[in-house]
Regions:
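Negatively charged, low-complexity tracts enriched in Asp/Glu with abundant Ser/Thr
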Residues: 1-65
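N-terminal soluble domains immediately following signal/targeting peptides that reside
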Residues: 43, 48-51, 69-70, 96, ...
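Aromatic- and glycine-enriched beta-alpha-beta binding-site module
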Residues: 58-98
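Ampiphathic alpha-helical segments that act as solvent-exposed interaction surfaces
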Residues: 94-128
Length: 128
């Protein structure tokens, strides 16, 4: 990554990735917990990705929760719909799969799967 202060810019990187994969909306990122240290190549971070239309009106239906962490030195992203806890969850590590949010078992991808998979791949390409 080519950032002078990456810990302050990861939120911007995630927001810009969401902007590109969920046009025409604008996104902001709020850190919930965790840290990101590029020098240690370690990450354990949870953020909310908040969506707005071009006029600035909140669109909570598109809000997401994103968890980023390393597992066996591999970057893993878990994306869920923030305000819809019963919707499937995207697990994007070495493999990408969709999980039932109630029991954690593999399930079919939802209609909107490509949008979230594209977001995960874009973020991974910046951080991996």
């Amino acid at each position: 990554m080519l950032f002078e202060n990456p810990s302050k810019n990861i939120e911007s990187l995630i927001a810009k990735s969401a902007d590109l994969t969920n046009k025409p909306f604008v996104h902001s990122v709020v850190k919930i917990n965790g840290e990101y240290e590029i020098e240690e190549e370690d990450i354990d971070l949870t953020v909310n990705i908040l969506c707005r239309d071009k006029e600035g009106k909140r669109l909570e239906i598109y809000d997401l929760e994103l968890e980023l962490f390393k597992s066996n030195k591999e970057l893993v992203l878990v994306i869920s719909k923030l305000n819809f806890p019963d919707e499937p969850i995207l697990w994007c590590g070495v493999k990408t799969l969709w999980m039932n949010s109630n029991n954690g078992k593999k399930c079919n991808s939802p209609k909107y799967s490509s949008r979230l998979e594209n977001l995960a791949n874009r973020i991974k390409s910046f951080l991996d």
